[in-house]
A protein has these predicted regions:
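Active-site-adjacent substrate-binding region
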Residues: 110, 117-218
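A non-catalytic alpha/beta surface segment that caps or lines the substrate-entry region
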Residues: 1-11
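Active-site-proximal beta-strand/loop segments in catalytic clefts of secreted hydrolases
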Residues: 8-10, 19-23, 57-58, 73-78, ...
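Glycine/charged-rich beta-loop-alpha catalytic/anionic-binding loops adjacent to active sites
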Residues: 29-40
Length: 218
């Protein structure tokens, strides 16, 4: 397992942390056929959408740097094991990062986890753990999206509580929220299945999320 951290403007004291997981599910456990459940998923949305977003953000930040320090963290092992309960071998990379921060006293102004943001029918509600534990970051992100006319995607209503890579960071005292659309496909029928493929991904959805993510850094 391996995390990767890309740091822009590394000397800046004021920093923003963006993270995404780059691993994909080793088995398609939501498939009906037991044989298919043993096959790894492509993870076009559940992993690769966040990675693609970060590649585009890195390119934009290289061309027009932010005055803020920006940390793009790719974490491994989010989807490796069993979400239970109990949790077994999941969120491994984010848990490691939370215990081994880049420097003593590392406290970014805010952090955002981007997960499953490539769905063609993208609707991102406010994840409950984020609302309860980092409401000021939720307000910052959703206000910026509304200001940009993207309230149709960043929906101003509470969703469900999701166990994801922001939890270990919240537990470590960092203010990190989860930007995620867990409703993937009709009746969530693509999540953790062999249907999580590139034909389900929308360039428009990725651009909307990317525009908001970049605007938060300006």
């Amino acid at each position: 397992l391996r995390n990767s951290l890309a740091r822009f403007n590394p000397q800046a004291a004021e920093r923003v942390l963006y993270l995404t997981h780059w691993d994909t599910r080793p088995g398609a456990d939501n498939e009906v056929n037991p044989a298919d459940q043993l096959r790894p998923i492509d993870g076009a949305n559940d992993a690769a959408s966040g990675v693609g977003l970060f590649v585009a953000l890195a390119d934009a930040l290289q061309k027009k740097p932010s005055s803020l320090g920006v940390d793009l963290l790719f974490v491994d092992g989010e989807d490796y094991g069993d979400f239970g309960p109990p949790l077994v071998d999941v969120m491994l990379g984010s848990t490691y990062f939370a215990a081994h921060l880049p420097e003593p006293g590392y406290r970014p102004l805010f952090g955002v986890l981007f997960d499953m943001i490539g769905d063609a029918d993208l609707r991102i509600p406010q994840e409950i753990n984020s609302v309860q534990r980092a409401p000021e970051v939720v307000q910052r992100v959703w206000s910026k999206a509304a200001e940009m006319g993207r309230g149709d995607v960043f929906v101003p209503r509470e969703g469900q509580a999701i166990t994801d890579d922001h939890i270990p960071l919240l537990d470590a005292g960092l203010k990190v929220i989860d930007v995620i659309d867990l409703d993937y496909g009709p009746g969530n029928s693509y999540h953790h299945t062999l249907q999580d493929t590139m034909d389900k991904i929308s360039a428009r959805s990725l651009k909307i999320v990317g525009d908001v993510a970049l605007a938060l850094l300006r």
